Amino acid sequence: MVLIRVLANLLILQLSYAQKSSELVIGGHPCNINEHPFLVLVYHDGYQCGGTLINEEWVLTAAHCDGKKMKLQFGLHSKNVPNKDKQTRVPKEKFFCLSSKNFIKWGKDIMLIRLNRSVNNSTHIAPLSLPSSPPSQNTVCNIMGWGTISPTKEIYPDVPHCANINILDHAVCRAFYPGLLEKSKTLCAGILQGGKDICQGDSGGPLICNGQIQGIVSVGGNPCAEPRVPAIYTKVFDHLDWIKSIIAGNTAATCPL
């Protein structure tokens, strides 16, 4: 039986930021260098995640990506040959839906990071829009990240890979993930026949539908990209009021129940 797995994985950080043990998008293709100006590489203590720039000072990622001495890289495409406009920041503040780090609670795996200073928009750095409405079933969406391109072999690309997947009926995910409630604030997305999926190391990265961030990579199957085992994404639309309140300065804002 495919085991549920949390998608952050050990990353051996080297000066070149080469990855030796993390994983990312399965069944995709190398992203175009201009395709992901909002994509953030989040790393700490040997772990890596993805993230999404939503304005010059704020990043969305998964709560289980939290850690000490976090760094965030913007404008990154090739890890070995960085863009000239690459920028690095650290968190100034972090905001969570949970008072504890029990991030496995469905629909609460979200973290909002305020940067220590704003990033400068450039050729390879620009925010992604928040959702204006939730995605409907069968919507084609995009996933992306810097990890393994094989579910069984350690094949790590230098540049992020992208893949298209579909928003699926929530019942498909409930059939596989014990305890996932029908009304949980999550999205179920993938390819029913398998072959395309997020994987370890993709945690916190975006699910992009119609040019907007609709989901945050949370939990998936192990091995990745198995038939009828889609991944679960925190549903950004259901957290819009909380996100906007925090950014507006209401740091006591509470998450939706």
From Swiss-Prot:
GO molecular function: serine-type endopeptidase activity; toxin activity
Claim: Transferase is one of the keywords in the record: no
Pro-piece positions: 19-24
Keywords for the protein's UniProt record, in alphabetical order: Disulfide bond, Glycoprotein, Hemostasis impairing toxin, Hydrolase, Protease, Secreted, Serine protease, Signal, Toxin, Zymogen
Top-tier EC class: hydrolase
CDD domains reported for this sequence: Tryp_SPc
Record: active site: H64 (charge relay system), D109 (charge relay system), S203 (charge relay system)
Signal peptide (UniProt feature, chain positions): 1-18
Disulfide bond positions: C31-C162, C49-C65, C97-C255, C141-C209, C173-C188, C199-C224
Primary site of residence: secreted
TM stretches of this protein: none
Coiled-coil stretches noted in the UniProt entry, renumbered to this chain: none
Matching Gene3D superfamilies: Trypsin-like serine proteases (2.40.10.10)
Localization: Secreted
Single GO cellular component term: extracellular region
Residues listed as glycosylation sites in the UniProt record: N116, N120, N121
Example GO BP: proteolysis
EC number from the UniProt entry: 3.4.21.-
Domain of life of the native organism: Eukaryota
Tissue specificity as recorded in UniProt: Expressed by the venom gland.
Family annotation (PROSITE patterns): TRYPSIN_DOM, TRYPSIN_HIS, TRYPSIN_SER
PANTHER family in the cross-refs: KALLIKREIN-1, KALLIKREIN-RELATED
Family the entry assigns: Belongs to the peptidase S1 family. Snake venom subfamily.
Protein name (record): Snake venom serine protease 2C
The encoding gene: TLG2C
